[in-house]
Amino acid sequence: MRTPFTSKHFTVHVDPESQMEYAILSTHIAPIQQGFYFVNSGYSDDGRYLWFYCAYPPASGHFLGVIDFQTDEIHAYPETAGSGWMVDPKTGTVYWGCSQGIFQRTPHPNDSPKQIAPLPDFCRKAGVRGAGTHLTFTPDRREILADLQTPFGSSIGTFDVVSGAYHEWYRTVPGIPYNHAQMCPTNANVCMVAHEVSFDPKLGDYVLPAFVDGVYPRLQIIQRDGTRTMIPPYENFATHEWWASDGKSIYYCCHERIVRDWLDGRKPEIVCEVPIPGGNGTWHGHSTQDDRYFVMDGSYPCMGKDWWRGCESTVRFFNAETGKIVHLLTRNPVVNGWTPENPSIYHIDPHPRFVLHDTLITFTATTQGRVDLAIAKVDQLIRATR
């Protein structure tokens, strides 16, 4: 079976500063091709299938393509347009949400999409068009967690994979959206969501949420019975978050840091500090199953701002055993003529993530003058940070 480094569809590149290698998907089935959002892996556990995002400007949405490394073929599946894409690592089947509900599709071109759950009536009647930021399985893979965004609040709950029934765990009030729902990897009764923004009716726009009892309210833990616990973040700020593999703690980004919270009342623990003067040291991050290695993206100051959609970015690797860091990709340049006034309509942040049993990292690169899916080997990064 082929790999990204032996497939005819990939071209290997070397970062000119760090000398780290990565493979770019150079066969294009769409003008824009990206790695999955960092919460979910696009890989099947056997390494045969790799799903990726595709887009055709000016259309604002995405659909999926898939690489079959056994046949060395690429297939485009426009019918997967929607949101929340999640791959079952055991089978390579992809799940996603749209205005009709939750669907699944195998990687095989002769198969067709299958609906496994309709949206609840209260969502369909309200014109809800998606089923979550990124779907995640319960540990037993019998249910799928979703965050449903409705005019009357966010509904956090699970869909039964067999019956399609929806069980609501928690609902917010209108104007307080909870998104980025992620199931605990070890407990089917616990999930994490993000209070990322709030709607300001005076501005007619979404803004950062107001403090709640003096606490920045991004990090929220929700139980199946509807119990909600707010986690006070380090220095009262947090951005993108993810579960540790044992389900006993969470990680999140905080300016130039990755921070760990043990969810037991202990003070948050700083994992690493990786500042970028004038920019943002960490946007998104991810960790290996053994919590020894971390990867994160960040932004450089670009056209007078510290961040905008499509600005210059970087991907870095941190070795927690040695405390050393190396650039996997030193600089993603601006492409497609994007500017702060005319930013990308696509979420093209690198979104690095460990995949395939922590042997590879998938991310999004613009080093070839376009938006590309990129993949790197982890072992070279470990050697570079010993």
Question: What do the PLM-derived regions correspond to, one by one?
Answer:
Residues P78-S154, G164-Y178:
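Asp-box/WD-like beta-propeller blade repeats and closely related beta-sheet repeat scaffolds
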Residues S26-Q34, A76-T80, A117-R129, Y170-G175, ...:
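Surface loop/turn motifs at the tips and blade-to-blade linkers of beta-strand repeat domains
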Residues N40-Y49, G84-T93, G97, R129, ...:
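Blade-terminus and WD-like Trp-Asp/Gly-His loop motifs, strongest in beta-propeller folds
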Residues R2-F5, A55-P57, A146-T150, V193-V215, ...:
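Short, conserved, GDST-rich strand-edge loop motifs in beta-rich repeat architectures
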Residues P31-N40, A59-I102:
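Blade-loop segments of beta-propeller domains
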Residues Y346-R386:
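Blade-level signature of beta-propeller repeat domains, shared across WD40, Kelch, NHL, RCC1
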Residues M1-A23:
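Blade/loop signatures of beta-propeller domains
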Residues H255-I258, V274-P333:
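Loop/turn-rich, solvent-exposed surfaces of beta-rich toroidal or solenoidal domains
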